[in-house]
Amino acid sequence: METKLVREVMIPIEKYVKVKEEDSLYDVIQTLESYKTAHNGRAHRDAVVVGEDGKFIGKVTMIDIFRALEPNYNKINVEEIVEGGKGELTEEMITSAYKDFDFWVAPSKTICERGMAKKVSEVMHIPSDGEYIMEEESIEKALHLYVLGAHQPLIVKKGDAVTGMLRFGDVFEVIRRDLIAC
């Protein structure tokens, strides 16, 4: 297996979907849809959040959007539930939480209203240090970060500058190709 570097697989930041803090979730979805249409159906499922100066400040992922559209997720502590179950998320825990918190019972009209009202600044993810990876690192290191639970996608840097995004699916594709070549 030939070692690939992160910079060989990442999506350059200038080619990634960008939104601003003041945009609504509806705006995010529209921006993602426009990107998909302009790129022959190839879709990004998350967006980079940039400040007024155009510099990276965070990201909005599918999980961030789902949690914003269903506010009852804010009432539970997933880590606490998993730890209480000895590190496992069982069918019983999932069913119990689903019933106890009435997840996804709001009509789509309510979800539409939430999507229009929620701002990116309210739901965006501000990455921790463990979610950044340098361009010159190996794909294996990126895979290691993902397996240990890094919030997707990883943010790629060169020095102090954010230069790209590394999606889990793109890392998987590198490994898949290597396995097929065996």
Where does each model-flagged region fall?
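Tandem CBS (Bateman) regulatory domains
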Residues: M1-K15, M62-E131, L143, V147, ...
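Residue-level detector of functional hotspots within protein domains
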Residues: T3-L5, E33-Y35, G51, A106-K109, ...
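DNA-contacting interfaces and partner/effector-binding or oligomerization modules
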Residues: V6-V17, E21, Q30, G41, ...
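Short N-terminal micro-motifs specific to bacterial/archaeal maturation
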Residues: Y16-V19, F56, R114, G130-I133, ...
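The conserved cystathionine-beta-synthase
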Residues: V19-A43, L69-N72, Y132-A150, K157, ...
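A glycine-centered beta-loop-beta connector
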Residues: L32, G41-I63, Y146-G149, L154-G169
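Short, surface-exposed, polar/charged, turn-prone segments marking secondary-structure boundaries
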Residues: T37, D46-V48, K75-V78, K86-E88, ...
